[in-house]
UniProtKB/Swiss-Prot annotation:
The modification Phosphoserine is found at residues 14, 51. The keyword Phosphoprotein applies. InterPro entries: Globin, Globin-like_sf, Globin/Proto, Hemoglobin_b, Hemoglobin_oxygen_transport. The epsilon chain is a beta-type chain of early mammalian embryonic hemoglobin. Residues 3-147 form the Globin domain. The lineage of its organism: Eukaryota, Metazoa, Chordata, Craniata, Vertebrata. One of its GO terms (cellular component) is haptoglobin-hemoglobin complex. This is Hemoglobin subunit epsilon. PROSITE patterns: GLOBIN. It comes from Callithrix jacchus. Keywords: Heme, Iron, Metal-binding, Oxygen transport, Phosphoprotein, Transport. Transmembrane segments: none annotated. Pfam families: Globin (PF00042). Belongs to the globin family.
Amino acid sequence: MVHFTAEEKAAITSLWGKMNVEEAGGEALGRLLVVYPWTQRFFDNFGNLSSPSAILGNPKVKAHGKKVLTSFGDAIKNMDNLKTTFAKLSELHCDKLHVDPENFRLLGNVLVIILATHFGKEFTPEVQAAWQKLVSAVAIALGHKYH
């Protein structure tokens, strides 16, 4: 189990409160699909994913990105119990969707990049460290069913 200090929790929740989940979620998933094109195979039903502009403008990518980032809100509310929080999603992604758990780590890293671009100077090394710890812990929780 990952332990978050009070300072880390404050850094995470402070930034989360300013986050536009719809915008950042679509951007994060879109960037994942552009930078790591092999991840597109999990989104065959999303329509046109033929170019970066098609991906970033795709309404299904934006909608699913919002859904994904909304689940990070659950992580923030349950930082001390991520394994239980993501048990059902882990099972879904493992048993039904067969998603490589490495993709969770990649998405987390993309999210950290999105945060850095959106928050600039406010995204200090300390804030980055807290968020990196969270996205890593979420990736581990999502990959739990695979073990």
